[in-house]
Amino acid sequence: MYIHEKQLIQAGKLAAHAKKAVVLLHGRGSSASGILSLSHHLQLDDALLLAPQATNNSWYPYSFLAPVANNQPALDSALGLVGEAEAKAAQLGVAPNALYFVGFSQGACLVLEYVGRNAKPYGGVIAFTGGLIGESLTLSNYTGDFGGTPILITSGDNDPHVPLYRIEESASVLRGLGAKVTLEIYPGKPHSISPDETLLANKVVLS
């Protein structure tokens, strides 16, 4: 088991010239620099980019469907890193309604878990193949009010890592917290991010 070293890559616009800030969370086996390359396919030219790096390139050791205790202390440490990225954006003068979150796979799960536990009117959330974390969901963990925050969740209909039932369950929980959730499921899509998904993210969340 492990906790995360504090590593945060800052890229994109300087805070003084940015219209928004975006926290990007990489998937298992990837890196902060890898997820930053996704910014070239999203409408983020006006954004300050903040990308935490997971120790061992993994936010938590087991499946996101494992009992939460099995993924500790790495999971709580990872959530803390996301919180520090949000605090960094605030320190640089970015209001919550100009703060966005983007994640893929394990990073998408972490994004949804973080915002679900800290719901407020954010700028928007993009989860490419992800769902809320845990063997079963502890609904009391998810508090606050998104105030209509747009949240996009995309996935394939038979993803090998993120089952559709958990994606749908997660969308329901987030809607209950006041988010405007768009759920897009692609038949036969592999475990990756497709051009259709980035186009939809630009339209639904970033436009």
PLM features: what roles do these ranges have?
Residues 2-97:
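Serine-hydrolase catalytic machinery in alpha/beta-hydrolase-like enzymes
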Residues 28, 168-175, 179-207:
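C-terminal catalytic histidine-bearing segment of alpha/beta-hydrolase fold enzymes
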Residues 35-38, 139, 163-173:
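Short alpha-helix in the alpha/beta-hydrolase fold that links the catalytic acid
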Residues 101-103, 128, 154:
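Short beta-strand immediately N-terminal to the catalytic nucleophile in serine-hydrolase-like folds
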Residues 120-133:
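A conserved short beta-strand
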Residues 102-107, 111:
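Gly/Ala-rich beta-loop-alpha elbow adjacent to hydrolase catalytic centers
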Residues 37, 113-117:
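Active-site signature of alpha/beta-hydrolase-fold catalytic machinery across serine-
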